[in-house]
Amino acid sequence: MKILSVLLLALIICSIVGWSEAQFTNVSCTTSKECWSVCQRLHNTSRGKCMNKKCRCYS
């Protein structure tokens, strides 16, 4: 039971820290496809996602 609580705590800490290294932009979008060129231009990566009508780039 102790191990389970330690694992749960570790999972929560990892979720809070946000190790995804996402970079937010102020560019409006409706689909993730629109973010690919924006992320390439701004952050030199083609991995982007449209979240809450804003582009979010991942490194």
UniProtKB/Swiss-Prot annotation:
Site features described as Basic residue of the functional dyad, chain residue numbers: K49
Source organism superkingdom: Eukaryota
Annotated Pfam families: Toxin_2 (PF00451)
Entry's Gene Ontology BP terms: defense response to bacterium; defense response to fungus; killing of cells of another organism
Compartment(s) of residence: Secreted
Entries under PROSITE patterns matching the protein: SCORP_SHORT_TOXIN (PS01138)
Signal peptide location: 1-22
GO cellular component terms, A-Z: extracellular region
Membrane-spanning ranges: none
Tissue specificity: Expressed by the venom gland.
Keywords from the named record: Antibiotic, Antimicrobial, Calcium-activated potassium channel impairing toxin, Disulfide bond, Fungicide, Ion channel impairing toxin, Neurotoxin, Potassium channel impairing toxin, Pyrrolidone carboxylic acid, Secreted, Signal, Toxin, Voltage-gated potassium channel impairing toxin
Sites marked Aromatic residue of the functional dyad: Y58
GO molecular function: ion channel inhibitor activity; potassium channel regulator activity; toxin activity
Keyword Transit peptide: no
Residues the record lists as Pyrrolidone carboxylic acid modifications: Q23
Region (Interaction with Ca(2+)-activated K(+) channels): 48-55
Disulfide bonds: C29-C50, C35-C55, C39-C57
SUPFAM superfamilies listed in its UniProt record: Scorpion toxin-like
Miscellaneous: Negative results: does not or very weakly inhibits Kv1.1/KCNA1, Kv2.1/KCNB1 (Ki>2 uM), Kv3.1/KCNC1 (Kd>1 uM), Kv11.1/KCNH2, KCa2.1/KCNN1 (IC(50)> 1 uM), KCa2.2/ KCNN2 (IC(50)> 1 uM), KCa2.3/ KCNN3 (IC(50)> 1 uM). Does not inhibit the growth of Gram-positive and Gram-negative bacteria.
Biological role stated in the UniProt entry: This toxin inhibits numerous potassium channels: shaker (Ki=227 nM), Kv1.2/KCNA2 (nanomolar range), Kv1.3/KCNA3 (nanomolar range), Kv1.5/KCNA5 (Kd>100 nM), Kv1.6/KCNA6 (Ki=22 nM), KCa1.1/KCNMA1 (IC(50)=5.9 nM). It blocks channel activity by a simple bimolecular inhibition process. It also shows a weak interaction with nicotinic acetylcholine receptors (nAChR), suggesting it may weakly inhibit it. It also exhibits pH-specific antimicrobial activities against bacteria (B.subtilis, E.coli and S.aureus) and the fungus C.albicans.
Entry note about domains: Has the structural arrangement of an alpha-helix connected to a beta-sheet by disulfide bonds (CSalpha/beta).
Protein family according to the UniProt entry: Belongs to the short scorpion toxin superfamily. Potassium channel inhibitor family. Alpha-KTx 01 subfamily.
Record's protein name: Potassium channel toxin alpha-KTx 1.1
Organism: Leiurus hebraeus
